[in-house]
Amino acid sequence: MECLYYFLGFLLLAARLPLDAAKRFHDVLGNERPSAYMREHNQLNGWSSDENDWNEKLYPVWKRGDMRWKNSWKGGRVQAVLTSDSPALVGSNITFAVNLIFPRCQKEDANGNIVYEKNCRNEAGLSADPYVYNWTAWSEDSDGENGTGQSHHNVFPDGKPFPHHPGWRRWNFIYVFHTLGQYFQKLGRCSVRVSVNTANVTLGPQLMEVTVYRRHGRAYVPIAQVKDVYVVTDQIPVFVTMFQKNDRNSSDETFLKDLPIMFDVLIHDPSHFLNYSTINYKWSFGDNTGLFVSTNHTVNHTYVLNGTFSLNLTVKAAAPGPCPPPPPPPRPSKPTPSLATTLKSYDSNTPGPAGDNPLELSRIPDENCQINRYGHFQATITIVEGILEVNIIQMTDVLMPVPWPESSLIDFVVTCQGSIPTEVCTIISDPTCEITQNTVCSPVDVDEMCLLTVRRTFNGSGTYCVNLTLGDDTSLALTSTLISVPDRDPASPLRMANSALISVGCLAIFVTVISLLVYKKHKEYNPIENSPGNVVRSKGLSVFLNRAKAVFFPGNQEKDPLLKNQEFKGVS
């Protein structure tokens, strides 16, 4: 009898050993074990419990630090990158994306095989074999041996067969997602996406873990593991962007007085969960202007005082949500009994059949219940003085002396409103204002009237776009204009005037020289003692003209001055 007990104990032990040796999903995918409450209340649609058995024969399990990881991929290690569009409003879908990054010079081709990139050299140099992994050939060999596409190794770790959708043989990576005590298996290529509905997910941060396997003949080899934290919230994720026309830096939340600020509300809703919801925006700008309620996601507001203000925004949306439990049916009214009767009836009270209450039959749960969800945003805004406006009131062409240079100088007379600028910048571009040709910035010293002249150089004639900016520590004010610079041809009015002045000057100098020469000759060949006074006075002008004629026309006169003297004597 004692031997029989030993034999039965041995059989029980032998039967128990395979159960103890078999791994489960939670043993492979993570050490964090959710509580029984979380397992019960976080049921994800299409996911399975991690209490299921893991097929370790097809999908070997390697711990971190195992030396086999170094040889899991030819040419290096594969890195998996896990991202999500978290945070997610409870009830909406959250999407996870996994992308595989291969070693240098490797990529996935159109057939799902891993090949070397052309003309790419890695540490091992150029490879004669174009394939890193030729899974197409492996798949054909496997089908040839089995004679059918239904193979015992085309299954997931829990034994479920691969879905045979078109092109499934080109998908050679197996992704196992694990969160909240549940797992999801997916066959894919070098990148996959998985969406999860968060209606039953506990609020707060949660952990998603992913293990990636690759084909290896008739089995699979782990190549990467990755994890990431995602957040499920009952608050609408809200972001607000603020923009002001002349604000120098919108990220510092410092803005200008007397200029409108545009507030734009961005709701993080990548799954479009709130597309059919009515959304209300309630604003409090903190400047005693009261509350402003709108259904538009953009609003403008102008602060008229300097200082610091607290901005508050509340977003309200009616979103699909769980229906509240029906209220308990009202008890039928009865005459008020005595205390002893009450105690007796309480002890013997038993619930009656549900059909006795006609109200219970009409209480059918509404499947389209809605619940109000709220989102909040707060910011502290500083309002300061700034340059509000800038205008170009006059443009003047600066006249240059001869020789005329190739460039032109233009003076811009500029006025501004608001604070006093400390610098001026001009950007000279083509007529479309897209191709910048020149940028000049310089400090300025402006009086309280804010009137200044900016001189800029233009290289050559043509039409230019001029952007002129006045700035200080907190603001930038911009104005633009188109200017046409004329061609500087030699026949310009100023050039002609200068040429005329030069010609007149040269003529005056020439006449002066001739007059001096004539005067010198007249003094040398007109003896005073031999000429009577009356003749000199009456004939002086004739003599002067004759002598000038002799100088200009020497061929028609006698060359001997003695003959001239004799002639004048004969006349007298």
UniProtKB/Swiss-Prot annotation:
Gene name of the record: GPNMB
Positions bearing carbohydrate: 93, 134, 146, 200, 249, 275, 296, 300, 306, 312, 459, 467
Keywords recorded for this protein, A-Z: Amyloidosis, Cell membrane, Disease variant, Endosome, Glycoprotein, Membrane, Phosphoprotein, Signal, Transmembrane, Transmembrane helix
An example Gene Ontology CC term for this record: plasma membrane
Function, as annotated: Could be a melanogenic enzyme.
Residue ranges, annotated region (Disordered): 320-362
InterPro entries per record: Ig-like_fold (IPR013783), PKAT (IPR045219), PKAT_KLD (IPR046846), PKD/Chitinase_dom (IPR022409), PKD_dom (IPR000601), PKD_dom_sf (IPR035986)
Name of the featured protein: Transmembrane glycoprotein NMB
Localization in the cell: Cell membrane; Melanosome membrane; Early endosome membrane
Entry's family note: Belongs to the PMEL/NMB family.
Transmembrane regions: 499-519
